[in-house]
Amino acid sequence: MLRAQGYAADKPIGMAAQQTPAYLAHAGIEQRLGQPLPMAAIFTDETGRTGPLSSWFSNKPVVMAEVYYQCAMMCPQVQHGLTTGLAQTTLKPGQDYQVLVMSIDTMDKPANAVDEKKTFLSEAGWTNNPAAGNAVHFLTSDQASIDAITSATGFHFVRVPGPDGKMDQFAHSSVIMFATPDGRMSKYLSGIDYPARDLRMALLQAGDKKISNPVDLLILYCCNYSPAVGRYSVSIVRILGIAGMITLVIVAGMIFLLTRKPKGLAPSVAGPALKS
């Protein structure tokens, strides 16, 4: 499980190490790859449109974030990391993928979702991009649907007290998730910084698209996805394997060139001996 990052787990600079609060043991991520999402669960988007989760799925992979809109700590960083990374990929929102940002707080309403979406589109440079506007949605819901989606995605969170003592904040992990077009969990990326390369590979895999770009093929082959850490990492064994095959081809080619007989040259025939 990827444990909670941020909130109470972060200590102010200079503060002595303290024991992690017991309630944080219940916050984290349990990666449920292949798990079907609750497509019948009811949500409401930033426009006020209400419908089953399937309403926001089509024939494209979906990148998802589970946050709460009134968060002033880690959630904005997760969304900023996502917008920055997506804007740097060559994939296009609406054409290649959809984005769903879902609130885990029943106090969040469509009005909050409107503001969050405006910020998201602005940070990605998509304010005047109609395709992006139609591909990015911020969802709110009741507790039953929130429980259904977070259970399916393995997103564990706990309500915790804020600075004023009110139980109006949440401890949770910083993570984004990827779902297949038919609504099954595909990948998780942890942290608050999501490199464009990682996002592109995760979306391509989630969409189960044919990999026709040689660069993508090489990267996917040279990289292992580690469910334990939620990151792509370079596999040294695979790189050495590729290097070994390339070396073998080069050596075989050199041997062939050095040993083949030149064409057009007849064998020499000894002529008559010269008389002195």
Report residues per predicted region:
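Juxtamembrane/start-of-transmembrane alpha-helix segments at the extracytoplasmic/lumenal side
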Residues: 226-247
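Short active-site neighborhood of thiol/selenol oxidoreductases, capturing the structured segment around
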Residues: 52-82, 99-101
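N-terminal targeting signals for export/organelle localization
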Residues: 1-40, 44, 252-263, 272-276
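Extracytoplasmic/lumenal ectodomains and periplasmic regions of secretory and membrane proteins
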Residues: 12, 16, 162-222
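Structural microenvironment flanking redox-active thiols in thiol-disulfide oxidoreductases
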Residues: 79-146
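Thioredoxin-like thiol-disulfide oxidoreductase module
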Residues: 21-24, 109-121, 141-169, 210-211
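Extracytoplasmic
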Residues: 36-38, 58-61, 94-99, 133, ...
